Each structure stands twice: as structure tokens, then as C-alpha cells.
């Protein structure tokens, strides 16, 4: 149906008169009576088309005649009140509601609706199932144009948002994750992380997790040690190390980037170092003396531990020569390791030589007897 421009309304004009020569008084009487009749049938009518009103003066006696005079053309699905064949009276209102095509999208599902509703609000009431908690992308008072309209409706969903470790459960009428964050006034920083794409469609019971990431540059002065200088000592057992000259730490300015996630440090990366004072390396004497294979000590270790120099069975003795912890530490083994199992073959033999010198072969009574060493 297409409303047209209001037709020109002819009105009785009393400002100008046309002199008539009347032959008889009977003719004059007839004209007078006709004029009174015309005035009596003139009606002031309001035509309301989709909320837009026009006033006109008509001589028509029916609604159909009034609409024809107003230039209103009706479509098959348009609604007229009163009906077209209804008689019309002075100061009546004729209401026309034209049929429009509306694409109604509810949660992504499209419905093509033919409606005579004037506004979006009227449409939603007509369709039903839409509540005040739903989000509508159009102004409820917006007039639906003749060309039609697309209206999207989003239902609320209960979701959880974990923002930097703080969890909130909310009901939001949002189409996607981005809209949900906007409704909660949540902004993401350039480094922040989120577990779902922002354009992902929001569903009931969705769980959104946001990790707040902060990168901070920290500069501090720290001490450092230089790599030691080693000097071989052929008289000391292999693996034996003795500090000949102490070193001294240096200092340097270190700049690093510290990344925190939800307030907890995740990583620290050095990006620059500037040496302030040089470090002095320590001088360490390192023994190179080895004990020949198949020595008496190897035979004794074979008897005591099956030749396993790293054994520690938890029975109170350890190492290839089965040192008791007190004996090991008393004769200097702590310089190599907390127990004999952590020391090398040569280091264990060097301690064993000290024990043998102090206690004799009786420190290993059973095995030295079976080997015929004593």
C-alpha cells in the first residue's frame, strides 16, 4: 500500500458569489434546499496511515470513498478500521495499517514476518516471546518503514567471567564475547590474554577467562663471579680440587623484562648487561693423579661393594669401599661429597689411604682377611 500526497479538497467558498438570474421563485427554493443538503452531508474526517494523520473534508459516505479521496491505495494484507463498506460520520477517524516485511533475528535464527505493526515495540508485542530482559538492536519507538526492517533480538545467558583471578557470574543479553565484555565495561590491554575469540557467539554457561599481563623493565646492580682458573696438580688424586687463591666477585648493571600474569611472575628475561667492576677469578688446584687399575683398592672394592664406587644402599655405608658416614667425614671426605657415593674412585681411595694409615687394614676386617691382605 502506498500513501500518496493528500488530494486537493474542494471546499465551499462563500467569499465570492455568482449572480443568478432565476426565472421563478420555485427554482430559487430548489437551489436553497439543495445548498442546505450539501452542507449537511459535508464531514471533517481524520485519516491515520501508520500513525501519520491527515485531515480532510469529504462528501463521501463510506470509508472506501474517504480513502479514495485521500489517495490511499490498499494492499491485500493491509488492515482498515472501520471496514471499507462502513458508513462514515463527521469527525470520524479512519485507521490504516499497512503490511510490511520484517526480518526478525532471534539468537541468530531468522524469521520473515509480515506485520501491520507501526513500531518495533508493536512488532515485538505482536510476535510474542520477547521480554524486557532481551536486547533489541533497534529503538522500540522506531517506525517500521514501508521498505521493511531487520530487527535482531538477543536473549540473556548466564556466564562466568574470570578477570585476572576474580570470578563473576552474570546474566547478559550479548551476541558474542566482545559484547559481553562491553556490557561489563571490561577492557583488554594490549598484552592481556583471553581464552576465547572476541567474535565467538556467546552461549549459556560460557566461561570467559582473562589473564592480565604486565611487562615491566627492571634495572638492578648484581654481583657475579668469574670462571675460575684451574692448575693441574699431579700429586693430588684425580678429581681433588683445592682453592689456591680466592677470587673476588664483580658487579654489573642488569636490565631485564619481568612478565607477570595476574600479579604472579611468569618469566624474567635479561635484555641488557653493563659491567661496573670486573670479577677476579679464583685459582684452583685440580688433582690429576690416578690409581692404577686392579690395585689393592679395586680388589677391596670388588669384595666390599661389587666394584660399584657410586653405591649407596641406605644401610649406613656407601661408596666402593663402604665408608661409614662418620669415618668419611672425619678423614676429610666432606671436601668431596657429603657421603662416599658422591665422590670419584680416586677421591675415595685418597680418603681410604688416610684411614688405612691410621687404623690399618683392620678397618675392612672381613674383606682384607679373605683377600689375604693381612
From Swiss-Prot:
Q: What is its main location?
A: secreted
- The broad enzyme category this protein falls into is hydrolase
Q: Report the GO molecular function annotations.
A: hydrolase activity
* EC number(s) given by UniProt: 3.-.-.-
Q: Where in the cell is it found?
A: Secreted; Cell surface
Q: Which Pfam families match?
A: DUF348, G5, Transglycosylas
Where is the region Disordered? 228-252
Q: Which UniProt keywords apply?
A: Glycoprotein, Hydrolase, Secreted, Signal
Alphabetized SUPFAM superfamilies for the sequence: Lysozyme-like
Q: Which GO terms describe its cellular component?
A: cell surface; extracellular region
Residue span, G5 domain: 210-290
Q: Where is the signal peptide?
A: 1-40
Q: InterPro entries given for it?
A: DUF348, G5_dom, Lysozyme-like_dom_sf, RPF
Q: What induces it?
A: Activated by RamA and repressed by RamB.
| Highest taxon of the lineage | Bacteria
PTM comment, free text? Glycosylated; by Pmt, by at least mannose and galactose. Other unidentified sugars may also be present.
Function text: Factor that stimulates resuscitation of dormant cells. Has peptidoglycan (PG) hydrolytic activity. Active in the pM concentration range. Has little to no effect on actively-growing cells. PG fragments could either directly activate the resuscitation pathway of dormant bacteria or serve as a substrate for endogenous Rpf, resulting in low molecular weight products with resuscitation activity.
Family classification:
Belongs to the transglycosylase family. Rpf subfamily.
Please state what the protein is called: Resuscitation-promoting factor Rpf2
Q: Which gene encodes it?
A: rpf2
Amino acid at each position: 500500500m502506498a500513501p500518496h500526497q493528500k488530494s486537493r479538497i474542494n471546499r465551499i467558498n462563500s467569499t465570492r458569489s455568482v449572480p443568478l438570474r432565476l426565472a421563478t421563485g420555485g427554482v430559487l427554493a430548489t437551489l436553497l434546499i439543495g445548498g442546505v443538503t450539501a452542507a449537511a452531508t459535508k464531514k471533517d474526517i481524520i485519516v491515520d496511515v501508520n500513525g501519520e494523520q491527515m485531515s480532510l473534508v469529504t462528501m463521501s459516505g463510506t470509508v472506501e470513498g474517504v480513502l479514495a479521496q485521500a489517495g490511499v491505495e490498499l494492499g491485500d494484507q493491509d488492515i482498515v478500521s472501520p471496514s471499507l463498506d462502513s458508513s462514515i460520520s463527521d469527525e470520524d477517524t479512519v485507521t490504516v495499517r499497512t503490511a510490511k516485511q520484517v526480518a526478525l533475528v532471534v539468537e541468530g535464527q531468522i524469521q520473515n514476518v509480515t506485520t501491520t505493526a507501526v513500531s518495533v515495540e508493536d512488532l515485538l508485542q505482536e510476535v510474542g516471546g520477547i521480554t524486557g530482559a532481551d536486547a533489541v538492536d533497534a529503538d522500540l519507538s522506531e517506525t517500521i518503514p514501508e521498505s521493511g526492517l531487520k530487527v535482531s533480538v538477543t536473549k540473556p545467558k548466564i556466564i562466568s567471567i574470570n578477570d585476572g583471578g576474580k570470578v563473576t557470574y552474570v546474566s547478559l543479553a550479548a551476541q558474542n564475547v566482545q559484547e559481553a565484555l562491553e556490557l561489563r565495561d571490561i577492557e583488554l590491554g594490549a598484552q592481556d590474554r583471553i581464552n576465547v575469540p572476541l567474535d565467538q557467539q556467546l552461549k549459556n554457561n560460557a566461561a570467559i577467562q582473562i589473564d592480565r599481563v604486565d611487562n615491566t623493565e627492571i634495572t638492578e646492580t648484581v654481583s657475579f663471579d668469574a670462571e675460575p682458573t684451574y692448575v693441574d696438580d699431579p700429586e693430588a688424586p684425580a678429581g681433588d680440587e683445592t682453592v689456591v687463591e680466592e677470587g673476588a666477585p664483580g658487579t654489573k648493571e642488569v636490565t631485564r623484562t619481568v612478565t607477570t600474569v595476574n600479579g604472579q611472575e611468569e618469566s624474567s628475561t635479561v635484555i641488557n648487561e653493563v659491567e661496573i667492576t670486573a670479577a677476579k677469578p679464583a685459582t684452583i688446584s685440580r688433582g690429576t693423579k690416578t690409581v692404577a687399575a686392579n690395585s689393592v683398592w679395586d680388589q677391596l672394592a670388588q669384595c666390599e661393594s661389587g666394584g660399584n664406587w657410586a653405591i649407596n644402599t641406605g644401610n649406613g655405608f656407601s661408596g666402593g669401599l663402604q665408608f661409614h658416614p662418620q669415618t668419611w667425614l672425619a678423614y676429610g671426605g666432606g671436601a668431596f661429597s657429603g657421603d662416599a657415593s658422591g665422590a670419584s674412585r680416586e677421591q675415595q681411595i685418597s680418603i681410604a689411604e688416610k684411614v688405612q694409615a691410621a687404623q690399618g687394614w683392620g678397618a675392612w676386617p672381613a674383606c682384607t682377611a679373605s683377600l689375604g691382605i693381612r
